Amino acid sequence: MEISYGRALYRNFLGQSPDWYKLCLLGFLILNPLVFWVSPFTAGWLLVIEFIFTLAMALKCYPLLPGGLLAVEALFIGMTSAEHVREEVANNLAVVLLLIFMVAGIYFMKQLLLLIFTRLLLGIRSKTLLSLAFCFAAAFLSAFLDALTVVAVVISVAVGFYGIYHRVASNRDEGQELVDDAQLDDERRATLERFRAFLRSLMMHAGVGTALGGVMTMVGEPQNLIIAHAAGWSFGDFLLRVAPVSVPVFICGIVTCILVEKTKSFGYGEPLPEPVRKILREYDDKSRQKRTRQDTMKLIIQGLIGVWLITALALHLAEVGLIGLSVIILASSLCGVTDEHAIGKAFTEALPFTALLTVFFAVVAVIIDQHLFAPIIAYVLEASPHNQLSLFYLFNGLLSSISDNVFVGTVYINEAKSALQQGVIDAKQFEMLAVAINTGTNLPSVATPNGQAAFLFLLTSALAPLIRLSYGRMVWMALPYTIVLTLVGLACVQFTLVPFTDWLLQSGWVSTPATTALLH
């Protein structure tokens, strides 16, 4: 007997998502207009919490769907306007271009990346040393490249590793789905679970590494550039100003990496299973034997394009996304990828996340229009100058954990500059606050995927369901790093930032510009 149209509509709504999840979302959609009618401020915070919930349930349903429904309703009931959302997207066009083109560009270099990281995996048998290598490499690259680019590279490599083992273990062709484990026997399934744990730990070490390196330089994160511009700092000024906080935090982050691996706590410590190592080694040997001069030339070209990529990004020759587009053009042209469908595969990873990020901008527009952060900012500016540093750091960290850290950093640096213009603080205090804001948005935000765009990209990537990396598991695995980075950062902001900056000023390494210079 055929079901009714109403039942069919309900089954189609969010597809295979659990019934309880569908009912929750329907409840949100009914509740929000009612709360907005009573209190727009409360409704705004409710929307933020609901959006975080959809991110937390990313493995139940891709957040674009439920989050998008909530955002569309927010527009309809007047929590924000379509024009404001357009402005937010326009303001973040560089990030959108980055996601569309840079992530796709990395796809065309995956042969070289897989070769390099396969040698790295097979060459370093110690899991602790391997974790350090991933964490340090991610930190170094993120100091000069964008964190999303770095994470995209590591994701591409991890999917490659997973695919090699899964296809061999399940006796399937390259085109088969990687999510289906039905063909695996119990022994191979157990090995696969250990391999998943191994990949999860490497991905988290690399993800945290992007935060450790990204905080150090003005090009490491988008909000760093905004803060540096507001304070009138050059690349060297920024590096030195942030060093009293960023260097101790980096050292403690590396120590944390070693400790969690040695103690095998918080989901870390799983070594590469020997059956997987054997398969990867056999794959590497076969690839080497089958490699023709044409294949070798492709690897050489990809290596040269990699040099171009790093050089162009380090020298800021163009917007990151446009550099990514040049990578696509060069790699596809010189490696002979001419079919439209083959080129189209490069974009399948990034476009859903780009759409999700646009929905996120709609939520940011609601946060601005409903003045959700206004009470917190007012409270912080009422504190004494010395306490302002730690309060700015803590509230930046708290809000960056639940919201976009680019948005939070922008809001706080604008408020600090407004206080400078009104004579509430002087130029020196403004520069101290700029460091507190920068470190506050970058360090504690590793607590959840919401704060770090790179973490959110990892959570919603094709890799996450393969290695069983859920929102809750990411929060749990990030917890030791969150505690260490937050507390060490807070201690440095409170105790070492001011004296070390005074020493830099006295030594002539940096200088405080006149207040009038900062106001322009």
From Swiss-Prot:
Localisation: Cell inner membrane
Main location class: membrane
A cellular component term, taken from the record's GO annotations: plasma membrane
Topology term for the membrane: Multi-pass membrane protein
GO molecular-function term, one example from the UniProt record: sodium:proton antiporter activity
Function text: Na(+)/H(+) antiporter that extrudes sodium in exchange for external protons.
Name of the protein described by the UniProt record: Na(+)/H(+) antiporter NhaB
Organism: Cronobacter sakazakii (strain ATCC BAA-894) (Enterobacter sakazakii)
